Each structure stands twice: as C-alpha cells, then as structure tokens.
C-alpha cells in the first residue's frame, strides 16, 4: 500500500526532486496528467528521466492538448487497482482533480495548494465553487502564508500544513565570488502579461545606465522587444543546467509579477547568492526580508522600484549578497519534506 497517491500536472524538475526525496521516506505513486507543457521557461523543464518512484504518465504530449475524458478513465482504472492511504491532488483547476475529489473518500483526500489570495477569487460564484471542492478535502498542504490567507477567506475547516515551498530546486556546485555592483539585473521566467514585464521594461528604458537581461519565452516577447531600449537584452529560453552561469553574470534578480503563486526562481537566485527584488504579490516574497537579502515592492509603483535600483552600490550589494549566501535552502527543503511525513 502506498502512503500517498499523488496526482499532478506535469513532471516539472522541481516536483521530481521533491518526490524523489519523499520516496526515500515514504512509499509514493505519482500520476502525471501530461508529460509536458507549452508554457515553460526552458526545453528541459519537465522530464521523468530522473524519477526514483513509481509513476504513470496519462498523456504523452503537451498538457494543453490532452484528452480530459480519456485521462479521467485512466485515473478511474488506476484508482481501482492501486491501494493508498492518502491521495494528494495538485490543485482544483482540472476536471481530473474534481473527479478524484468526489470519487475518493474525503478522509483520504489532500490538496497541495499553490494559489494565493491575490490571484484566486474567493468571493461570488468562483469562491462558492472552490468551497464545494474544499468540502471534499480533509488536509491542505499550503505553500505559504498567502496561501493560508486564501484558505481562511474560503473558511476551510480542515487540517492545514504549511510546506514553505512547491518543490526542490536543482543545486549544482558552483564557485562563489564576491561581486562588485555593475548595474546588471536579471529576470527568468515566462514572458506573459501576468509577469508584469512591460512595467519592468518601462523602468529600465528610463534608466539607461542599468542593464536588464530577460530569459524565457512567451506571447509578449515580440511586443516587449519592440519597445525595449538597447540596455534590455532578451536571451530566449535557456536550459536549466546553464541557469547558474546566468545568475553569476548578474548582480540582482527581479520578479515583478502581478500574480505569482510561488516563484521557485527566487529560491534559485538565493541559492546562487543573488539578492532578490520581488513583488509583494508573489508567494515566495516571504523568503525575502527588506534590506537583508533583497527588497519587496508594490508591482504598480514604478517610482519606488526605480528608487531601490538607483540606491544600489558596492556596499549595499555585498551586504545583500552575504545574507543571500547565508540562506539555508537545505534546511528549508528538509522542513518541506518533513511536513508530508
């Protein structure tokens, strides 16, 4: 019998890393809805090649092209033959998750909540629908404090466990060097509207002495390139194994999102020793302490972010980098794993 039957969207690298660690302590079986997605930052974002646990992939292809009814039938077959103590679904956004919530016993049903109070409606019809889903859930594994705020707003009465993360990043070895401020800022992620990159481009257009490098692809890329000055560099998608080199080339990481359920790239930036400027709408903003390892800003306030950027110098950067270096990512990951035990 499995301790957990986990059902999640795709085999993203950070989920594979988390499940591999869980599999050292627990017996788990993972159902991946699809093998890949068209919405990702790099070509090697998802793969089951490194999986060290039992799993099944329902659809071999992009998540957006999957056959939902066929997936539900496959889930029905798996549930009839696999014995488990708990079943953990990774959201309430898919028909597959709703099928599981209403066909499995409530006492076994768990939810991994990666939505925050900022991007998920809790009032009106949408809030009512979420409450119906939660009525079938006994335990919620909430990523952080903004996720717990959403549960409170939805009046969830079940058990809540806080994971302080959504997965485990890759941790390649690298040589740490002391940085001198060179005015180089970095963004890594999808180039879509909710990431608020037009806001960032307009700021750096007005600050030609600073450089912004944007890594990723998305529907806004062509438009943003057309309005960007020469101090804004678009690099396209870069494989995960080369991400460390990009952090090394830059001084500060920026995540300006209007909506960001977590923001795993913030953990990557801290791991590689970069301070982080982060929107207060991001779930992982709780990892950043103002003036210690970065700064938190309002993603609609250009003047405030411009002031933060202009204030950077060698001394401020080195102090922030020193604190970013001292961030214990392994301790955070150990705590995340322990929540499931």
Region roles according to the model:
Residues 177-195, 201-207, 212:
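Conserved donor-binding/catalytic core segment of Leloir-type glycosyltransferases
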Residues 95, 109-125, 136-139:
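A short, histidine- and acid-enriched strand-loop-helix "catalytic/donor-clamping" loop
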Residues 222-241:
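Nucleotide-activated donor-binding/catalytic signature segment of Leloir-type glycosyltransferases, i.e.
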Residues 135-175, 180:
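Donor nucleotide-sugar binding/catalytic pocket of nucleotide-sugar-dependent glycosyltransferases
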Residues 316-341:
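A charged, aromatic-enriched C-terminal amphipathic alpha-helix characteristic of glycosyltransferases
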Residues 290-291, 295-302, 309-315:
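Conserved acidic donor-binding segment of nucleotide-sugar-dependent glycosyltransferases
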Residues 258:
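Aromatic "clamp/platform" in nucleotide-sugar-dependent glycosyltransferases that forms part
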Residues 275-278:
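Short hydrophobic beta-strand element within catalytic cores of glycosyltransferases
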């Amino acid at each position: 019998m499995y301790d957990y039957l986990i059902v999640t969207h795709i085999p993203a690298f950070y989920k594979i890393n988390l499940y591999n660690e869980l599999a050292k302590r627990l017996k788990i079986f993972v159902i991946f809805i699809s093998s890949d997605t068209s919405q990702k930052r790099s070509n090697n974002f998802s793969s089951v090649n490194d999986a060290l646990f039992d799993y099944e992939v329902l659809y071999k292809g992009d998540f957006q092209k999957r056959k939902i009814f066929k997936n539900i039938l496959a889930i029905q077959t798996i549930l009839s033959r696999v014995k488990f103590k708990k079943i953990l679904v990774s959201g309430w956004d898919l028909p597959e998750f709703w099928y599981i919530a209403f066909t499995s016993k409530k006492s076994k049903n768990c939810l991994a909540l990666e939505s925050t109070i900022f991007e998920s409606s809790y009032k009106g019809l949408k809030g009512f629908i979420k409450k119906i889903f939660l009525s079938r859930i006994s335990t919620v594994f909430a990523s952080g404090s903004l996720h717990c705020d959403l549960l409170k707003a939805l009046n969830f009465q079940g058990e809540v466990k806080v994971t302080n993360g959504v997965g485990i990043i890759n941790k390649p070895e690298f040589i740490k060097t002391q940085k001198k401020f060179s005015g180089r800022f970095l963004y890594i992620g999808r180039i879509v509207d909710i990431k608020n990159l037009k806001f960032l481009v307009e700021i750096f257009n007005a600050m030609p002495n600073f450089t912004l490098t944007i890594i990723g692809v998305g529907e806004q890329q062509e438009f943003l390139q057309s309005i960007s000055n020469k101090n804004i560099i678009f690099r396209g998608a870069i494989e995960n194994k080369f991400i460390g080199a990009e952090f090394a080339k830059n001084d500060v990481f920026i995540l300006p999102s209007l909506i960001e359920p977590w923001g795993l790239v913030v953990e990557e930036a801290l791991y590689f020793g970069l301070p982080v400027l982060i929107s207060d709408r991001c779930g992982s903003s709780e990892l950043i302490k103002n003036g210690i390892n970065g700064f938190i800003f309002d993603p609609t306030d250009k003047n405030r972010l411009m002031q933060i950027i202009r204030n950077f110098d060698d001394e401020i950067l080195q102090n922030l980098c020193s604190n970013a270096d001292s961030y214990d990512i392994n301790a955070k990951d150990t705590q995340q794993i322990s929540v499931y035990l």
